[in-house]
A protein has these predicted regions:
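Aromatic-lined carbohydrate-binding/catalytic grooves of carbohydrate-active enzymes
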Residues: 111, 126-155, 168
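Surface loop/turn signatures of beta-propeller and other carbohydrate-active proteins
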Residues: 35-54, 78-120, 139-142, 157-189, ...
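Beta-rich accessory regions
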Residues: 1-37, 56-76, 92-95, 297-298, ...
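Structural motif
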Residues: 25-26, 78-79, 142-146, 202-208, ...
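Acidic, glycine-rich loop-and-beta core segments that form the ion-binding/anion-interacting portion
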Residues: 293-295, 303, 311, 315-329
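Hydrophobic core segments of beta-strands in well-ordered, beta-rich domains
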Residues: 16, 67-70, 118-138, 160-163, ...
């Protein structure tokens, strides 16, 4: 039992020393002889990798504060007392959030510290983009699932706003969605309503609402509002369906999706399920989305159902598949044959893709988690782990009788470019390549590390080879050559390079490929073979 004096409680935070290869320690925060918080942390046993803060303002006004710490592992009393963590645990009036990672990107969202995976509850309101995310505030590996929160006015530069939805007695806080209740259907006009998975003994769905534009949330007293005995029952994504003047919600259940409807965001009626025998079933279906969009160059509108799957991706591990069809508010009907699988991105590091609610001008703006469950916990960073993709505007296009999802960099990415273009490759930039046929693009450094991208116009394919890209020893699954169909010719390629990621997108939206890279020094040399001219814009 680690007792906290009133004097210590008046300081900003208790710094907890973390060692990533240590056993988990279970920490319960006790006040007035009651448990007020519980979380897990890998407390240092023989060296300190980094510190994480336990903020004291969470416990303001509470008396008799103490930490009940249980360290897992086979320790004698002497061995337990000799652990490094005890002498390195300290109170402080500050926590240093300055970046100390060579691989932290400049124009991608990352957590200031700690672990991040799926984007959650994204919405736009009053000029602000709100991004919530699966977050571990007590370490840079997956644990203690909480909703972190960041905001942006331009989708490029993000400000961390804390962790407004925390674990409770029902469970930790898994993925979900948030909507702006413009129609005042339940919890106040303009309220932001979040629906998320409570991960306890069973996975159930809970609700929280905000009346201050998503800064703080109040959990609904009737939680959980949807229950089931199915083990994988999660990631509710809700949206207002103007066609039926009701809310719809789609949820991932094992290897299919369930669709619900509601008048008030609290009471949900099961409508139908989709997915049996359709698409890829190499892993668990997760993080769904469902949206109506216009088909480019036609008068048609179609619905797209996004289904993230892990494992089962085209290059192994996690990926985003999607289905195009019709939806009447009750049932989704897919246009393609069951055996057809369509992928939104053909790289290894594009998962958990979902879109912002209430985006302006009818836009469908999506962001993905830029990693892969094969190695996400092992990538060579420590202060934080994982970033998000650049924002992408989604649409639909037709090619050879099939309808596909188009993915283009959001216009905010063009606005973020430096005014002048040049030929010099920097660590954080956009490279625009105008193509006339086959091309091979190589990014390299003076350590012999390189990434090779190849466009084959006749075969209608694009590939990216990261097998010599830099550090790869953290996972046998990292080295890869990823390959994508281009559904016709590519005349302009937009390549976003940002410290530890490369995203290559067809400017017309017909192909996207997202891959992490960890070069020991930034790539500083470009060669383009074939008929291609390029320009490079800095992004800061």
């Amino acid at each position: 039992l680690y007792r906290i004096s009133q004097e210590s409680q008046n300081q900003k935070c208790l710094l907890l020393p973390v060692q990533e290869n240590a056993e988990i320690a279970n920490i319960k925060v006790i006040a007035d002889n009651k448990q007020v918080k519980a979380f897990n942390v890998k407390l240092a046993k023989d060296h300190v990798d980094y510190y994480v803060p336990l903020y004291m303002n969470e416990f303001a006004g509470l008396k008799g504060l103490a930490l009940d710490i249980h360290v897992n592992g086979d320790y004698s009393k002497e061995g337990l007392n000799a652990l490094t963590c005890w002498e390195n645990m300290k109170f402080s009036d500050s926590f240093d959030m300055k970046n100390r990672e060579q691989y932290r990107p400049v124009f991608h969202h990352t957590p200031v510290y700690g672990w991040m995976n799926d984007p959650n509850g994204m919405f736009y309101k009053d000029g602000v983009w709100n991004l919530y995310f699966q977050y571990n505030p007590y370490g840079s590996q997956w644990e203690n699932m909480t909703w972190g929160h960041s905001t942006s006015t331009d989708l490029v530069h993000w400000k961390f706003q804390g962790a407004p939805i925390q674990p409770d007695a029902i469970g930790t806080i898994f993925s979900g969605s948030a909507v702006v209740d413009k129609n005042n259907t339940g919890l106040g006009k303009g309220a932001v309503v979040a629906l998320y998975t409570s991960a306890g003994e069973n996975q159930t769905q809970s609700m929280a609402y905000s009346t201050d534009n998503g800064k703080t949330f109040t959990k609904y007293e009737g939680n959980p509002i949807i229950t089931s005995n199915v083990p994988d029952f999660r990631d509710p994504h809700m949206f207002w369906n103007e066609d039926i003047k009701k809310w719809n919600m789609i949820m991932a259940v094992g290897q299919h999706m369930e669709i619900y409807s509601s008048d008030n965001l609290k009471d949900w009626k099961y409508e139908s399920s989709f997915g049996e025998k359709y698409g890829n079933h190499g892993g668990v279906w997760e993080c769904p989305d469902l949206m109506k969009m216009k088909v480019r160059g036609t008068g048609k509108e179609k619905w797209m159902l996004i289904c993230n799957i892990n494992p089962g991706g085209p290059s192994g591990g996690s990926a985003t598949q999607y289905f195009i069809g019709d939806f009447d508010g009750h049932k989704f009907t897919c246009d393609s044959k069951p055996e057809v699988t369509k992928w939104m991105d053909y790289g290894k590091d594009h998962y958990a893709t979902v879109s912002f609610d209430n985006a302006p001008n009818g836009r469908r703006v999506a962001i993905a988690w830029m990693s892969n469950w094969q190695y996400a916990n092992q990538v060579p960073t420590q202060q934080y782990r994982s970033g998000n993709s650049i924002p992408r505007d989604l649409g639909l296009f037709e090619y050879k009788g099939e309808t596909y999802c188009s993915v283009v960099p959001s216009p905010e990415m063009t606005a973020a470019r430096s005014k002048k273009a040049g030929k010099k490759l920097t660590a954080s930039c956009e490279m625009v390549v105008n193509l006339k046929g086959n091309a091979t693009i190589t990014l390299s450094n003076d350590k012999g590390e390189k990434v090779v991208m190849n466009y084959d116009a006749k075969a209608e394919t694009f590939s990216m080879d990261r097998t010599k890209s830099g550090k790869m020893d953290f996972s046998k699954d990292f080295a890869a050559v990823t390959k994508a169909p281009t559904y016709g010719n590519i005349s302009q390629l937009r390549i976003f390079i940002d410290k530890s990621s490369i995203e290559a997108l067809d400017a017309d939206g017909k192909m996207s490929m997202t891959n992490l890279v960890f070069p020991s020094k930034p790539y500083n040399k470009v060669t383009v073979k074939g008929k291609g001219k390029y320009q490079i814009y800095d992004i800061k």
